[in-house]
Every structure is written in structure tokens, then in C-alpha cells.
Amino acid sequence: MLLSAPLRHLPGLLLLLWPLLLLPSLAAPGRLARASVRRLGTRVPGGSPGHLSALATSTRAPYSGGRGAGVCKSRPLDLVFIIDSSRSVRPLEFTKVKTFVSRIIDTLDIGATDTRVAVVNYASTVKIEFQLNTYSDKQALKQAVARITPLSTGTMSGLAIQTAMEEAFTVEAGARGPMSNIPKVAIIVTDGRPQDQVNEVAARARASGIELYAVGVDRADMESLKMMASKPLEEHVFYVETYGVIEKLSARFQETFCALDQCMLGTHQCQHVCVSDGDGKHHCECSQGYTLNADGKTCSAIDKCALSTHGCEQICVNDRNGSYHCECYGGYALNADRRTCAALDKCASGTHGCQHICVNDGAGSHHCECFEGYTLNADKKTCSVRNKCALGTHGCQHICVSDGAVAYHCDCFPGYTLNDDKKTCSDIEEARSLISIEDACGCGATLAFQEKVSSHLQKLNTKLDNILKKLKVTEYGQVHR
């Protein structure tokens, strides 16, 4: 009787003390985050002292910057959530689980060619809320998650995994085949000990290619979580103390499913161009005019001239940027097509350098000539006047007088006069003696005149013979000079 009064008031007392019991979960964000992770040396429900949560032991580089950073793109997945909705999960806590699922969906690229999502709800029975091919729109998918209701009693985790493997991860249900290389991922969330065997069925699921993540809450059995999860366990087993902080795990899964864009991060090591292939993969390419080396990263300029496809008629010249250009031999100019060449007519262009006459020899060549009466100098361009008097071929008996480039005339020594042939000369006195003062009609005068003419003709022949001899000597000298 003495104890009955205090016991009658115990429910009311618990209601008054309930907010105080929740104080650790209402602590500052930093403390709250720390409370969600079991540390070394602390007891984990269902486990042994010394267990360390996956969140505390992850060796991956922390993801920073969120999806807005532009370097993270979720990998395409076939993702199935297996959520415990047994009686131990209160309605408010089940809402937290749905919020956790929705936040993970927010970090994913949802679509027929991206990530597909299904939800398996379980307690003592199993219900597939929707299949992988049911929704391809993120907003519709989240609304479907929000409409899920708890099933009530029991925790048949093994049956839930088997149902997911046999009914959710099928091609008919929307799972993509092995040739697609799309990962199959299942995340099971539970707060209790399984009421059936999970070890064997989880092993079969993993052997079929399903990657299993196990998330334990509050009273979850850690050994069962380890049996269900894929290895390494430190990356696939998670534990939080309350459903109130489970949504914080969404950031951890965002990091897990994130494919970092190495091209945007600048860690690709491509010499020229980095091309993202999705799923965190990339390949290197080269700028135009370059080819990728065997290392798959560096580039070398393509020797297009060596390929014999350059089209240059005469000379191909490689440029530094991997391109090329055509050139021509001396005496040729590049045509408008920038490939073929045409012979330069230097005579027509006025660039020949000839003083008198330029003669085009074709093929871009030419030579110089001189006007008549001129001779080409040693430089093969300029001309000098040719002196015919100096050549000795003028034919003048006495004196040759040059009148320019090609002309000349003969002259006589003093006391001589130029004959009608304009080359030979006659003594003036002898010419006068030929004139007779006798009677021209007399026989004696006529005879005397004939004798004098014969004498002069003989002398003239003698002189002509001498001139011919001199000419022969001169010609011989010219030939053998």
C-alpha cells in the first residue's frame, strides 16, 4: 500500500521527465553529430565493447562542397531501400526513415538511364512499395516514399533481403542486366534483431552481385548487421543511436555514390583535353593536329608532311601547332589553292635585273641579253658597247672611227682622200697627176693615161693584198686568243 501511491504517479512523472531524457538528442549540432557515432571502448547494442562505427573509421577522402560543387555526379545505380517498419519503429521514427530515404534520393540523378529506385517495406511480412521501373521522375519518386505506411509487427530481415533479390532486382522489375555494368545496391535500415536467418540469404544476395549496406538504429543487433553487409564492413555498416539523427547519414551515402569528375577537379593529368565519361571515369584526347601517345595522357604533333596526304605540290612544312603549310621552290610562287605552284615570270614582273633584254626560259628561269652592238658583262646582267673598230673587222684602209654602238666610218691619213668604196684611200698628188693637160684626144695622151691607170691599179692591188694579209692575221689572233 505504501508503494502503490508512488507507482500510480509514475506515468505522469515519466511524462514530465521525458524532455530531459531527450536532451542529448537536442544538443548542439556538433555534439549531436558526435553522439551519432559509437567510439572505441563504448558498448554498441548487440555488439561487444571496442566496436568502431563505419562513420568513424572511413578512410575515404571526405566529400566537400556538395553537389553544387560541380565535381560530383552520382553514378547510375539500381538502388533498393529495404526499410524496417515493425512495431518497434514508432510513427515519428518511421517518418525520419522516409526523410532519410528522400534525402539520399535528392543527391542522386534519377531517370531511366540514371539511377532507378525501389522500396521494400518489411516487418513480419514483406511489401514491395514500388519497383525500379515505376518512377523515373525524382519528385514523383519522393512523393511515393512519403506515402509509405508502417506494416506493424515482426522483423523478418532475411525474408526482406530474399524478396528484394528475387523480385526487386529482376529485369522485369526494372533492374538492368549484367552487360550494362550498372551496380546493384541495397540499403537495409533496421532497429532490432532479425527474427529469421539472415546470414545465408545475405550471402546469396552478395554472390548475385548486390552490394549490401546495413544501417542499424538504437537496439539494432551489430552482429546481424555485419552478417548482412558487404565487405569491407567499415564501409558498409553504419550505426546511429536514434532515428532523430539518421538523416545525417544521407551525406555519407552521397559521398559513397558520388563519382568525382576528375576533369573538373584538374587531377586528370591529360596534357591537352580531358573528357568525362561519367561514373567518375575519364579519358584524354589531343588538340587538332596531335595524336595521343601510348601513355594515354600526353600528345605528340602529327607529322602531316610524312603522311603524304598533305597535297603540297613541291614543299610541305610542318608547323608547331601540329598543322602544316605548303611552299614552292625558288622561281615559283604558291597559287591561290595554297598547295600548287606556278613558275614566276621574272621578265614580266620586272624583277629580272637585266639592263637590256630579259629572256624567259620557262620553269621560273631566265637570262639576260644585250642590244646589237653591245656585249653582256661578267655579271650576266649589264651590257657594254661593242667597239667594231677595235675588233679589226671594219675594213678601213687607214682609220676606223666609231659612231656609237653599231656604227662606224672610215677616214684617211693626211694627204689622202677616201675613195668611193668608203674604205680605201688615194694619194691626193697621184690623183692630180692623173689629170693630163695634153690634148685628151691625142694618141700620146690616151696612151699615157692608160699606163698611169695600169700603174695605179697595180699599186692598188698590192695594197689590197697587204690588207688581206693583215685581216687574216687579225682573224687568226681573234680565234686563238
Curated annotation (Swiss-Prot):
Tissue specificity as recorded in UniProt: Strongly expressed in growing skeletal tissue such as epiphyseal growth plate or in bone undergoing growth and remodeling. In the bone, actively synthesized in osteoblasts and osteocytes. Expressed in cartilage of sternum, femur, vertebrae, trachea, articular and epiphyseal cartilage, cartilage of developing bones and bones.
Cellular component GO terms held in the UniProt record: extracellular matrix; extracellular region; matrilin complex
Coiled-coil features, chain-numbered ranges: 451-475
Alphabetical GO biological process terms: cartilage development; extracellular matrix organization
Keyword terms: Coiled coil, Disulfide bond, EGF-like domain, Glycoprotein, Methylation, Phosphoprotein, Repeat, Secreted, Signal
Keyword Glycoprotein: yes
All residue ranges annotated as the EGF-like domain in the record: 259-300, 301-342, 343-384, 385-426
Endpoints of the signal sequence: 1-27
Protein name: Matrilin-3
